[in-house]
Every structure is written in C-alpha cells, then in structure tokens.
Amino acid sequence: MSRPHGYSKATMDRISREYNQVAKKINTGRTNRLQDQTIIFNLSESFANPNRVPGVSLKANPIPKIDHIKKETTSGIMISSGYGGGTADMEYMTLTGFAMCNFAQTLSTPYTQLVPYLKHNPTIVQSFKYATAIHPYSKKFYDRGTDYPKFGFKSFFYLGSKKHPIKHQQKIDRNTYLSDQTAYANTLDQLKSHHGAQFINLVTMQNHLPYNNLYNGINRYRATVGDGTDPAQVENYAMGIHYTDTAVTQFIKEIDKLNRPITLVFYGDHLPGIYRNSMKKDGLKLHETDYFIYSNTAAQRQGAKKLTRSTHYVGPNDFIAMAAEQTNSRVTPYQAMLTQLYHQLPAYALSTQQNGTNSFNSAPEYINQQGKVVSYSSLTKQQKKLWHDYQLVQYDITAGHHYLLKTNMMK
C-alpha cells in the first residue's frame, strides 16, 4: 500500500484524538455493547438474484422468502469487489473494515499475502469475548486455518477437523458441496452450545461453481439469457439459491426461538461467473449482490431497529458499523470512523469494469445511494478528508509503523 500523504506519528495521534471524540458523541445515544450481542456474519457463496443481470429473466423467482425478509428489515445491494471469485477478499473487508481498493495493485489476496505476516490484525472479533468460525469445507483455502486464530477466533469448525467437525452433513442431488442447511445446522449447534454472547463468521459453500447438472427439477426456473450465457447453468444456479432461500428462512425461525439478542448479517460475496455480459456495459450490475441484516425478537426487545439511512448501496466494509448501529451498540474510535464512512461516503469498491477475481486491484470506484458511479472529484472537502483519514489508518495498521496500536483507536 502506498504511503498516504502526511503520514506521521503526529498525524495518527491527531486521528486517534479526533475519532475518540466522534465515538463519544455516537455512544451518547447507544445503550448496548457489541460484546453482549451475538452477531453472525454470513457470507453466502456466490449469492445474487439473477433477475438483476441485464438480459436474464427466470420463469419464477428463486428467492421469494429472502425478498420478503429484505422488505421487512435492513437490506439492499452490496457492491462486490469481485466477479466470479474473490470470496476471501470480501470476507477480509467485512471482518476488518479495510478496503481492497486502498491496497497496492499486487496485493490481491490479504488472507495469503498480508494477514499471516502481521503481528496485529484488528477485526470486529476483538469486540467480543468469544468468536467462532464455521466453514463446511477445507481450512486450507486462503490460509483460513492460519488467519482465523490471528483474528482472534477461539474455534474453527471445518470439514476434516477432528476437534471441531462439521456435523449434519447433507448434499443436494448431484452437488458435491455441503448444503446451506448443513451450514445453518452447525451454526445453530454453536448457538445452543455456547449460551453467552459471541461472534460467528459463517462462510457457506453450496452455491460455489461449477453449475452443470447439479439439481433435479431446474425447469421451474427456466431462464431466458443473452448471447453466450448458458441457460442450463443459470437454471442450476437458480435452483441452488432456491435451496438457500429455504435454509435461511428456517434458520431465522430458529434464532427467533432463542431468548438472547442475535443479529444476522447475510450477504452474497460476488456473482457466479456464468454471465457473458459485457463488463464495460453491465459491469456495475455484475457486481451487485444481495444483503440483509436481521435482528431476532430478543434483540428487538433490547432496542435493535431497522436502519433506514444509507442502506440502498453498501460495501462489505460497512457491515461492522451497520451491525453496531442496528443493535444500538457502542463503538470504538475506529468503528466510529467506519460509521462516518458508512453514512457520509458513497459505497466504494474496486472498478466494476473488470472481473476483479484475485488478480490486480484498481483505484476506488464510488457508487452513491441511487446506484450511480460518482467521481472522487465530486466528493466534498469533508468527504475527501474522511477518505484520507481512512487510508492513513489502513496504511498504519497494515504497512506503516502501527502508531495507532499504542492508542485506544482500535479498542
């Protein structure tokens, strides 16, 4: 990452003092603590409604239940920094709040190129006394087995683990990956076995590529597609997210039965790479995934409320601030900065004119609440200052002298 202009100990001390004050102001109106909540970040592999893709239409809607949930709670479009890949990058951004578009072009996968080599990796995990990761697949991909302990996770449930095995293993028809129902059953086990507050990072696998001859009955989602796109792949994919639709809805019913505050942040990491649209023409649409943030009945009794501002278009970096705001939880100075970024800046991502599948990064692209790309030059002076402060913080923690670790900025 390039050294931002003005980087120095004095500058970072100024940033720490300033966002301490921002945090104090925000926390005046907050009554809860994150560490008393159970927050689940659920990365849903390749989840995005095909009906948003130009030239694609399906005979039926594969995700009616999730669409209904989205109408009832905080929800919108997440701008992904990948197409057809880049899962670990979206996961990294949600957990740290840092942006891929701030890194050097050659740093395309922080999980393998950065995290293992840093002594300190501040994440949302450190706001909790207990944290668990669940991934119904191998721990080897993207060095998760190395990175999760560095992030502060106490346990990691994965396929092949003897200490923390994946149970309730089910597959659907000819899909070789474990189902989303499997993922949620293991998450429910964790919620029931650890009775206190906790953070859970759940990464599913069911809808991972390939999308050939996976399911029976795909005719119910018969697809009309553009030139070059294989309708059978779209139909198989649609059937997969139909099963996700059912599994998520059932999981929400189960967490509503638990008498403690639980908030689920559900998001698709990227679209499946099955659409042969022009990236130059349709790039933004090919980087739009679905997200929602659902707080169970117990959380609502404690003051959790649907967010109504800045929710239409967000980035993975926004979920820490959004989860804290929805649960009315107090924030650290760094989380206060993320809160300002969420409310005051457009969503930001790598260029949506490229695939962005763990290859090379690009300059930031900004997308406003109307879903339009806006230029950096259109930002106000205050917005540019906030963006520069953010770059300084990311540089200090990941490539600089770690001045902020000697302050309470990240605590």
Which positions does each model-derived feature cover?
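Solvent-exposed soluble domains appended to multi-pass membrane proteins
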Residues: 24-30, 44, 49-411
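Membrane-interface segments at or immediately adjacent to transmembrane helices
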Residues: 1-41
